[in-house]
Amino acid sequence: MNSLLTDQIPYQETNSSMIQKLSTPPFNKWITALALGIVSSATVNADSIPTTILDPNLQVTTLLNTGLSQPMGIVFLGSNDFLVLEKASGQVKRVINGVIQPTPVLDLAVNSASERGLLSMALHPNFPATPEIFIRWTESSTGADSNVVSEVPLLGNRVDRYLWNPANGGSLVLDRNLIKLRALQTDNIAVAGHPGSSNANLQGNHNGGVLKFGPDKNLYLFMGDQGRRGWLQNLPNGPFLKAPLVDDTFGGPSPDNNHLSGVILRLDTDGNALSDNPFFATGAAIGGEVGTNIQKIYSYGHRNGFGMAFDPASGSLWETENADDAFSELNRVIPGMNGGWIQFAGPLSRLPQFKLIETTQFTNAMQQVRYPPTRVAYTPTLAKLRLFSLPGSLYVDPEFSWKYEIGPAGTAFVEGNALGSEYNGTLWMGSSRGFAQVGGNGGSLYRFHLTPDRLHVDVSADPRLADKVADNLFRATKFDGTESETLQIGTGFGTTPDIQQGPDGNLYVVSVTDNAIYRISRKP
């Protein structure tokens, strides 16, 4: 874990011109992004903070807390029957009536350094009639499980389609690869003509990967920015101030295969772009590898995230986004959205506060020192002008933000009245806790009501949140819940990369730090 906290050589700011913002800096510090860097090779002990649900009408039950190692997500095959994937073992296990079956249904050779590993899976919308399961994972270049940050192919993040065979306890058989994305972050190697980039550590973070099928029966994939600094991070000329205007040693800044990151992609079940994607025509006009990739983009300007959910009432896509140090986000994603990263995070109006926090409060940039926070614009107007605008793109403020990072994580909408009618249509969100945290809430669950038109978070019950920002505090570390008290519905869940509603209408919360799966249900 200490290697994830390594300090870096401070960057000396040169001129900034049209390049911008948010930088690189404490890019991840103690790997805030969900604390998901969870020591990839070790089992994390269960949290000593009690797991508690705050509504007396609800109860939380520990469904599993033995036999799992770093669980990342689940999918339900039926009532009391689900698959669970493990981050570092590369195994997909079947659980029937609360019992882990003796033989994994799949075992992949994964690289689990930092935020890599076996990360997400999704059932085909017509499952089991169409017996396909889609898996997002990071492969090891060694042919065996590895937590060594360098032991990964350049395009080591994969989405693969597997066929489910229910015979003999079940198994998954590879059908085809849909897409391969950047995994190797080599910014410790100097770019020709730009020796200042040589003091960055090899990284495996910003590897967030979530798979979800939308109501349109198409596949949505969140891919973290991988520390890239190009078009899709709102740097049209890349991070450098003079030629060659590239992103890194593998090219860029345009989104070739090595630089397709910080995006939500919308694909059919074969991995192809949809003709009604927002930038399909633009990509066709550009042509080539870059144009083909642009055709797949649903939204861009994202940093890193581990939560996506579709509102069953409206069909809208919501996602969580991790901050560096300032301004975690909850977003409603519209087609063609530009999330603003790296020009800013949080509401555009809070840009001065964002820049102040990033440049003064956290001094040890961990990654991407070639684009530090000192280069963030000084005014919201200038920051917005610096956005890289694909035709038809639109910047939209987050629906909710936290001043300091809380590590927002898995999300799920509640559909129906199994938890009580008051919860029907609510959005639940998990969170993280920092490695340095002692005490605290130990990983909260948050519950959001939406406005009647389902377009916004309804914060009318708490006047402090009228600006849709929780001005939480920094108390020796981040992950503080101040001003979120009225949103908080649970504590002590650890880091929760996945929340799913089961066939019974209850919520199932996956805790990667507690090695546990919790069930939230209505009391009898």
Roles of regions detected by a PLM:
Residues 4-5, 22:
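Leucine-biased recognition of intrinsically disordered, low-complexity hydrophobic segments
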Residues 11-31:
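Bacterial N-terminal signal peptides that target proteins for export
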Residues 31-41:
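Bacterial N-terminal signal peptides
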Residues 42-46:
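Sec/Tat signal peptide C-region and signal peptidase I cleavage site
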Residues 47-231, 235, 307-310, 315-323, ...:
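Acidic, Gly/Ser/Thr-rich repeat motifs that build Ca2+-stabilized beta-propeller blades
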Residues 48-53, 116-118, 128, 140-141, ...:
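Beta-propeller domain segments
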Residues 487-492:
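Short, Gly/Ser/Thr-enriched beta-strand-loop segments that form substrate-interacting elements
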